[in-house]
């Protein structure tokens, strides 16, 4: 089973990716993780990627594609994989398809977790983190017993910079510009499947499992 996981920031992709990986015994491949691994191991591609990152630049497609291709040749990908964070553009999607075709494989499904913008804004801007122990809360879904105070250590709770409304809206705008053409690309290829990401974790995973069961 070869899967692409798509969805906006705050859609719960990380949670679902872990569940899918465990249920279907395939590696969860996050581009962020493999970038960090290559940089840590000082591979040629990792060194090149670090140069762009250190200068505050986007890593070019050819470097990103090279790192992903290298990861997909590992033995644990023989029976499938779950890609999270790649591809981000149609050019990357085309390069991935070309690579898979070269090894007589193809994608089975592109899973899109759909969540309305207002739901994501509420989910992300409501998050709070303890400045001391790192415990996580949500002002609506998982509030602390005392407002602004950690239940565990009684220290202050803060909103991370990534979770401010302005930052979240900016991330959603970038996602829309990048990903809508990608969604249309996979629709044209007939492999996109959509799930409602506003439901509970178990309900979302149940719907995903039904889709993946059909596509086996």
From Swiss-Prot:
Catalyzes the reversible transfer of the terminal phosphate group between ATP and AMP. Plays an important role in cellular energy homeostasis and in adenine nucleotide metabolism. It catalyses: AMP + ATP = 2 ADP. This is Adenylate kinase. Its EC number is 2.7.4.3. Pathway: Purine metabolism; AMP biosynthesis via salvage pathway; AMP from ADP: step 1/1. Its main location: cytoplasm. The lineage of its organism: Bacteria, Bacillati, Bacillota, Clostridia, Eubacteriales. GO terms for cellular component: cytoplasm; cytosol. It comes from Clostridium botulinum (strain Hall / ATCC 3502 / NCTC 13319 / Type A).
């Amino acid at each position: 089973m070869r899967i692409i996981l798509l969805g906006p920031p705050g859609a719960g992709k990380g949670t679902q990716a872990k569940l899918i990986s465990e249920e279907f015994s395939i590696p969860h491949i996050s581009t962020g993780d493999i970038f960090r691994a290559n940089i840590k191991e000082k591979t040629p591609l990792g060194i090149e990627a670090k140069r762009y990152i250190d200068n505050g630049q986007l890593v070019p497609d050819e470097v990103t594609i090279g790192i992903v291709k290298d990861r997909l040749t590992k033995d644990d990908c023989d029976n499938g994989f779950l890609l999270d964070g790649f591809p981000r553009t149609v050019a990357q999607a085309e390069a991935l398809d070309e690579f898979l075709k070269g090894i007589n494989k193809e994608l089975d499904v592109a899973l899109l977790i759909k969540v309305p913008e207002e739901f994501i804004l509420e989910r992300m801007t409501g998050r709070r983190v303890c400045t001391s122990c790192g415990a996580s809360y949500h002002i609506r879904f998982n509030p602390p017993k005392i407002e602004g105070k950690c239940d565990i250590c009684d220290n202050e709770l803060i909103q991370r910079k990534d979770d401010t409304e302005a930052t979240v809206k900016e991330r959603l705008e970038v996602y829309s510009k990048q990903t809508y053409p990608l969604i249309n690309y996979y629709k044209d290829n007939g492999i996109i499947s959509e799930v409602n990401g506003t439901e509970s974790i178990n309900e979302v995973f149940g719907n995903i499992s039904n889709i993946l069961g059909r596509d086996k």
